[in-house]
Design a protein with these regions (language model features):
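Catalytic nucleophile serine of serine hydrolases
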Residues: 99
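Extended, subdomain-level signal for the structured scaffold at the beginning of enzyme domains
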Residues: 1-94, 103-115, 123-169
Length: 169
């Protein structure tokens, strides 16, 4: 059975990015673990709730076949410069990130010399990713080897479809 850990913010992660990807992983028979900064209940942007089974300090990315970083503004405020978040990205065998999450992940260096996308607000996220060595492109979804990135909830369906292809390899 394939294993995945989904990293979300404790307060205000993007519902559709999470639920579409979670459901696709379930259909692919993946064993899914939810993790957040703190091991407690996580609240979606639109109010739904899930429980994080692990705190980020307890997660090791190399123990899972894939690591998925879910975005939204609170992921930025909670995880920017977070050592555990960045460590997990570095340990990931296969890395998926959507919305603002690719920008936050880029600080780990895993996108160095790789082509990625993300949500972008007037060039800020693009500049941040490029500062840490990534090559940003304005596309809904980009797959670069074992990395899949997407620019936001509108690309969630394309994102999970590409992710499931990678999962099955």
């Amino acid at each position: 059975m394939k294993t995945a850990v989904m990293i979300v913010a404790n307060n205000g992660f993007q519902d559709h990015e999470f639920s579409a990807t979670y459901e696709a992983l379930q259909e692919a028979n993946a064993q899914i673990t939810i993790a957040a900064w703190r091991k407690w209940q996580c609240v979606w942007v639109f109010g739904l709730r899930i429980d994080a089974a692990y705190s980020l300090a307890e997660v090791h990315g190399d123990k899972f076949e894939m690591v998925i970083f879910i975005g939204w503004w609170w992921a930025l405020t909670q995880y920017l410069h977070n050592d555990d978040y960045l460590r997990i990205a570095q340990e990931a065998k296969k890395l998926w990130a959507i919305c603002i999450a690719p920008m936050v992940v880029s600080e780990s260096g895993v996108f160095n010399r790789k082509i990625v996308t993300s949500w972008d607000d007037e060039g800020l996220q693009k500049k941040f990713i490029e500062w840490f060595g990534g090559s940003w492109q304005d596309e809904p979804v980009i797959r670069y080897w074992n990395i899949v990135t997407a620019n936001g909830p509108e690309a969630a369906e394309m994102f999970w479809k590409e992710c499931v292809k990678l999962l099955e390899e």
